[in-house]
Amino acid sequence: MAAGPPSSVRAERVLRAACAAMAAAGALLLGFSAQTKTVLFIQKKAVPKDVQALWVLIVAAAAAAAYHVAQLARCFCMERLAITGGGGGCRRLGRAVACASFLLDKGCAYMVFATTVAALQACFVGLLGVDALQWSKLCNIYTRFCEQAAAGMVCSLLAAAGMAVLSAFSARDLFRRPCSPEYR
């Protein structure tokens, strides 16, 4: 009877799936948030493209979700190769994949965190207004839009935190692999 994967591999899978789900939820909540209001006989629609930082966050969160789904598939494929015995002679390839995974995990975490913080900063103007520039508080008018945007950004922040933990998993995986003899 074959034993299942180690608990660290299971934890990485669960965390990757959670990060993919949270990033996708953030992108979907932000992407489908829109609200139309009539102000002084003029209909005005609030959409994420009105705030450039929100649009960038949607793209970044969707790309991060796709990346983590691909990494999850890689985890399952590597386990399948290890079970069938087909991956025995590719240590250098395994180290290269671990290095690429580490760098991409770090980059993905930084990208999602940076775009989320930029979107939060841009949305605080809509939430609080700027008296010096006579910008009104838009969230008093577009309440549902602001609530959906806030939920999307919370999902993206949770995904970024999970991605930071995943980069620690990737670092552990990379530095546990032995170097090839010619580099020692």
UniProtKB/Swiss-Prot annotation:
It comes from the Eukaryota. The chain crosses the membrane at residues 14-34, 53-73, 110-130, 149-169. It is found in: Cell membrane. InterPro entries: CASP/CASPL, CASP_dom. NCBIfam families: A_tha_TIGR01569. Keywords: Cell membrane, Membrane, Transmembrane, Transmembrane helix. Belongs to the Casparian strip membrane proteins (CASP) family. GO terms for cellular component: plasma membrane. This is CASP-like protein 2C4. Residues 1-13, 74-109, 170-184 are cytoplasmic. Its main location: membrane. It is a multi-pass membrane protein. It comes from Zea mays.
